[in-house]
Amino acid sequence: MTKRTSAKYKIDRRMGENIWGRPKSPVNKREYGPGQHGQRRKNKLSDFGTQLRAKQKLKGYYGDLTEKQFRKIFAEAERVKGDTGEMLVGLLERRLDAIVYRAKFVPTIFAARQFVNHGHVTVNGQRVNIGSYRCKEGDVIQVREKSRQLALVLEATQLAERDVPDYIEVDYSKMTATFVRTPGLGDVPYPVQMEPNLVVEFYAKN
């Protein structure tokens, strides 16, 4: 288990929110940050603090992306004509690990990245082992046949805690997921409020 995987719930505690909607999240029992002083009353955040928190929450949701990774995606979103916040969400949702997670082939975004990295997935019939691989509309993602009986796959497909969004079409008989279209913010089933507009404001000032 990687350090990032074992630390996944630290993100929930740091944010004080159950950002993936998981039943086992520690914030279901308490709503304060990690550490023995977590129960102290929170001070009101400044504009900078609010923007920073929005950025940390969004990049944390996609598997605690590094600042370098997230900043690169944001820079790409800025170059595309349209609302930068919407473009940012669309680019994040086009990541292969995000689609594997959305399709419920694995239970967590962290498991999705590891699953892809270990070569369990193909895109249009070709094995791809890069979680950040960017899928296009119409791409067909499939779990390789020898990987379909893995315990985490069998567990994930039975999860009732989240639904597959309508921009992904899943056929569990073939273990395929077709990326139908690039979603906007309103299409993505985030369990908590995400504010990419605040991320845009953060990078505009920093």
From Swiss-Prot:
Name the GO terms of the biological process aspect. ribosomal small subunit biogenesis; translation
Every copy of the S4 RNA-binding domain together lies at 94-154
Classification via SUPFAM superfamilies:
Alpha-L RNA-binding motif
Assigned GO CC terms: small ribosomal subunit
Question: Where does the record place the region Disordered?
Answer: 15-46
Look up keyword Ribosomal protein and say if it applies. Answer: yes
Superkingdom of the source?
Answer: Bacteria
One MF annotation (Gene Ontology) recorded for this entry: structural constituent of ribosome
Q: Which cysteines are joined by disulfide bonds?
A: none
Keywords, A to Z, come to: Ribonucleoprotein, Ribosomal protein, RNA-binding, rRNA-binding
Instruction: Report the function annotation for this chain.
Output: One of the primary rRNA binding proteins, it binds directly to 16S rRNA where it nucleates assembly of the body of the 30S subunit. With S5 and S12 plays an important role in translational accuracy.
Summary of subunit composition and partner proteins: Part of the 30S ribosomal subunit. Contacts protein S5. The interaction surface between S4 and S5 is involved in control of translational fidelity.
The UniProt similarity line reads: Belongs to the universal ribosomal protein uS4 family.
What is this protein's name? Small ribosomal subunit protein uS4
